[in-house]
Amino acid sequence: MLPVIAHATTAAHGTAWVKVLLPGRPNSHAGWIPARSATPDNTRWQIVVRISRRTVTVLRGGRPLRTFTAVVGKSSTPTPLGRFFVEEVIALYPQDVGAPYALALSARSDVLQEFDGGPGQIAFHGTSNVGGMPGTAASHGCMRLNTPDITWLAHRIGTGTPVTIST
């Protein structure tokens, strides 16, 4: 599911188009697709990350519902800024790094072209088997949350949920 960020109609043919956020590099890039190719779906959920505060705030219907303290990217591998979305929610095995859940985002690291065999994808994930104290800047760009917090998030947030990461 790709979040729609704009609508337009071409005058010549009357074709309706929607502008959608796209995953991958460059971060926060978008493209236009015919509206007839899109299946409308709405979410009342939104996530806002404030790097300077090291917080993850979950909104429902535009109102803050929960705020969590997170580990964010360290200065050499910062968490990228921009407009993104949740690509997938993954239940991890207890022995996996970042267990028990990961919410993979459309964002990619601005520094690491690959990480641990993957494309340098940014995610919310747990602190299991990777550590880090929420409220610090110590990750490779991901946002790490304590187990109860990432579990709460994973049980409520679905694919396509918009995520805004700012300073």
Listing of model-derived features with the role each one plays in the protein:
Residues 24-27, 62-66, 160:
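Short, surface-exposed beta-strand-loop junctions and turns on beta-sheet-rich folds
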Residues 24, 37-45, 74-83, 90, ...:
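Exported/periplasmic cell-wall-interacting domains
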Residues 13-16, 49-54, 98:
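A short, compositionally biased
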Residues 2-10, 46, 54-60, 85:
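Beta-strand cores of secreted/periplasmic/IMS beta-sandwich domains, seen most often
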Residues 19-21, 57-59, 87, 125:
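Beta-strand residues in well-ordered beta-sheet regions across diverse protein folds
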Residues 29-31, 66-68, 82-84, 120-122:
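Short beta-strand segments
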Residues 1-36:
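SH3/SH3-like beta-barrel superfamily modules
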Residues 35-74:
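A structural motif detector for short, solvent-exposed N-terminal "entry" segments of globular domains
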